[in-house]
Amino acid sequence: MKRLFPLLTVLIVSSFLYAQNTIPPVHSDDACTDIVVGKLASVDGSVITSHTGACDECRVHVVPGRKFPKGAKAPVYWGIQNVKTPLEDYGEILGYIPQVRKTYTYFHSGYSHMNEHQLAIGESTLSQKKELRTNRKDGKQIMTVEQAMIFALQRCRKAREAVKLIGGLMEKYGFLPSCGPESEALCIADPDEAWVIEIFSVGTDWDPESGKPGAIWAAQRVPDDHVAIVPNWSIIKEIDLSKTEWFMASANYKQVAIDHGWWDPKSGKPFVWQKAYSPVPREWATSRFWLFYSTVAPNFKNWPNKKITNPYKGYDSYHQYLEDISIYPFSVKPEKKMSVQDVIAFQRSVFE
C-alpha cells in the first residue's frame, strides 16, 4: 500500500513527524530547509517532505473539519504566525474568499502542515529581486503563504490539487510576503507524489481590479526516484508547460521577466526561472545545496571541493568562494535510498 511518511516539521525547539508512527523530537536553532524524497527514492516506498521552520508560532493544534452553509465566506488572516495571541486567534482579517461546503481536519501551526488525507506541506522562504517586493502597507495583496497553506489543507486531498488551488489564490488575491519582503516555496506531497511550487510577488502597484495576476508562480513535480532540497533558494529552472504531468505555472511566468528586462525572448537563450526572479546567490544557500547533493549523490558530478579537511585552517570555514548556483539540479537520483531517519540526520547536520 502506498503511503506518505509525511512531514517533518522542526519548529524552533520542537519537531513533529506525522505518519503511522511518531518520530522523537528534533531540535533546531534556526533554519528553513525543505527536503523531499520521492516514493521510489525512499527505503519503504513512502513519499517524504520535511520542513525546518524557525517561525515564532510553534504551537500545534488540530483544527477539525466543518460543514458550512451555501454562500459562507472564509476569512483571510494577517498574523497567523503571532505566538502572542490566544491559540485560536489567527490575527487581523484582511478580507474574505468564498467558503467551501466542507473542510478537512488539519494540523495548525505557524506554517500548518498536514491534513487527514495525508496531504503534507513544507515551507521555505526564498529571495526575490527588489522590484518584485511588496508589503502590507504599500500593496493591496492579502494572501500570505501560511494562509494559502491552510486553505489547501482544508480543501485538498492531492498535491497537484493543492498546487492549483494555491496558485489560483495567489493570482486572484495577490501574494503578500510575511517573512520579510521575500518570495516563498512550498514542498507539497501526498502518498503518491511530491511537487515544489515557488511564488514571487509582483510589486506594490498591483490592483485586484486590474485583471492581472497578483503573483508569479511555477511548480515542478519531483520525479519518483529523485530527492530535492529547498535551502531558502529557488530551485526551478527551465519550464515546459507542454509536459503537464511535470510543470504548472501562472500565465505571466515569463512576461514579468520580459517587462523588467530580465529575459529577452529574442536572445535565443532559454528562459530560466531561477535566474530570472532570484537575486545574486548567497553562500548560506549554496552551502546547503552542496552539502545535500554531495552527500546523497557524490558521483553525480564533480561537486565543488568545499569539504573542510583542517578544522583549524581559516577564520571562518563556511565562508568560501561562491560557485555558480546553476550547477545544482532541481533534483537528483540518490545513490542510496533514503529513510525518514536519513532526512532527520541531514536536517540535524551542522557541516561537521
Positions of the model-derived regions?
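Alpha-helix boundary/capping residues
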Residues: L11, I166-M170, V350
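Intrinsically disordered, low-complexity segments enriched in Ser/Pro/Gly/Ala and basic residues
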Residues: L4, V13-S14, T286, Y293, ...
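Long, well-ordered mid-to-C-terminal structural blocks that present hydrophobic/aromatic surfaces
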Residues: D316-E352
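A contiguous strand-loop segment
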Residues: N21-V145, L165-Y318, K333-E335
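Short, well-ordered beta-strand elements within core beta-sheets of diverse protein domains
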Residues: M149-R155
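Bacterial Sec-dependent N-terminal signal peptides
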Residues: M1-N21
